[in-house]
Regions:
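Membrane-embedded alpha-helical bundles of multi-pass integral membrane proteins
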Residues: 1-281
Length: 282
């Protein structure tokens, strides 16, 4: 069966479970009283928050972006408490955000615009993202930001199990989240290294890539390229490796709304809300 079909057959149920999990949390949050919409239903409260957030952002976009960068991604307050903890947190959060952005750009341009360019000539620029001068930068930054996530994860695990500061409470779900991330990053680099070491895997289109340019097979993909030097004589079923990485990735996506990593999504709303209240009182 075609890998694209298999992936989407697994992906769409995953999205449904993810949205359901997020919906449970949002429903719980909306049970509280909302100033300005005290008698509203949950759905009315939800629309109220969306409208208020949308209007607030466009009224002061610079302020919102500043708070998002300084307070959420780079967690300025945490820096004053512990540099080690701040660095681990920043590498994880910034790595996730940056990887997501680059991956979306790469996926949208090489997966959709390139295909549309066959019928729409003005989209021919998209080939720069697949085979042109832009592709090496996409490959490098995906590799680099993924490496930041890996380093941040290792630092967090080291802090929890080796340094073990007195105020730290290591809960089961913290451990699950960290080891999920560690597994996905290591397996991702391993599969990349195996793909580089065995060009026949790419030719067979096992990893969904219709084309893998040279930039994805050299030192620009430094993590995978390093591992590839040790994998040339190793033979593993490439289909197994694909499932070995993709299935846990989708499971992690479903688990995300139920983990403490949810704060990547919610902390921005909480921080911005607190800053808005403080700004109103001034």
């Amino acid at each position: 069966m075609d890998k694209h079909l298999i992936f989407y057959l697994m992906f769409f149920p995953t999205v449904i479970f993810f949205v359901w999990g997020m919906g449970l949390h949002i429903s719980t949050w909306l049970e509280g009283s909302v100033e300005g919409a005290e008698e509203a239903t949950k759905w009315e409260k939800f629309k109220f928050f969306i409208r208020r957030g949308w209007r607030g952002f466009w009224a002061r976009p610079g302020w919102y972006i500043k708070i998002l960068i300084t307070e959420v991604i780079f967690h300025r307050k945490l820096l004053g408490k512990s540099f080690f903890r701040w660095l681990a947190h920043t590498l994880l959060v910034f790595g996730f955000v940056a990887t997501f952005v680059v991956d979306m750009i790469k996926g949208f341009t090489t997966g959709y615009l390139v295909e549309f360019s066959k019928d729409l000539a003005f989209l021919s620029f998209s080939h720069e993202f697949e085979t042109g001068s832009i592709r090496p930068f996409l490959d490098f930054f995906l590799e680099f930001f993924s490496f930041l996530i890996l380093v941040g994860c290792v630092m967090a695990i080291f802090r929890r199990f080796i340094l073990r500061p007195d105020q730290l409470r290591t809960e089961e779900e913290d451990i699950t989240s960290l080891f999920f991330i560690l597994f996905l990053e290591l397996s991702g680099f391993f599969i990349e290294g195996y793909r580089i070491a065995h060009p026949e895997v790419v030719k067979a289109h096992i990893y969904l890539a219709n084309l893998t340019p040279a930039s994805a097979n050299n030192w620009i993909s430094f993590g995978g390229y390093f591992l590839s030097q040790f994998l040339r004589d190793l033979k593993i079923n490439a289909d197994f490796l694909w499932y070995f990485h993709v299935v846990p990735s989708l499971i992690f996506f479903i688990y995300l709304p139920h983990s403490k990593l949810l704060h990547i999504f919610t902390s921005s709303m909480t921080v911005i809300s607190d800053r808005q209240k403080a700004l109103t009182k001034v």
